[in-house]
Amino acid sequence: MMCGLAALCLALSGATAAAAQEKCVGDGPHLKVIVEGLRNADGYVSVELYPDDPKLFLAHNQQLAVAHDKLTGMEQVVCLSVPKTGYYALSVYHDENGDDQFNRNKFGIPTEGVGLSNNPKIMFGLPAFEKVRFKVAEAETTIRIGLRYFLGKSAN
C-alpha cells in the first residue's frame, strides 16, 4: 500500500489549476467528471487528466489538464477539455482544508479523499494502468469517480 500510495501522494501534491474549464463548452471533446463520496463540502476537489501512458500516469508535471474547483456540495461536477478523442487516466483528490496540497500523515497515508478513473480498489499499491484507463469519445464523455478516505470518517 505504501509504495502505491506514495506515488499517488507525490503526483497529487503538485496539482495546480491549469487547462481546466468550469463548464463543458467549446470545440473538441470534453470530459465531464462527477466526483462522488465526498465526506463534506469543505475545500476543493482536484482532478488531473493524464495521457495514455503508464510511465506518465501520476508522474510530476505530466498532466494534460488540471482542475482545482471550490466545492459546491456533496457531489461535484468538473469539466475538462481534452486534446483529442482517445484513452486517458484520471486522479482526483479532496483538498479538504483548501491548502492546495494533498495532505498525508507522518506515515504517508492520505488524510484526504482520493480516487482514480474506473474506481479500482486502492489497497497495497496502485492498480494496473489498464484498470484506470478509459476512452473519451466525440463530444462529451461522462465518468464517475468515488473518493476513498483512508483515515477518518468516509461519506458512507
Give residue spans per PLM region:
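Bacterial N-terminal signal peptides
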Residues: 2-14
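A short, amphipathic beta-strand motif
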Residues: 29-37, 47
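Exposed aromatic-hydrophobic patches
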Residues: 76-82
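Acidic, glycine-anchored loop motifs typical of Ca2+
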Residues: 96-104
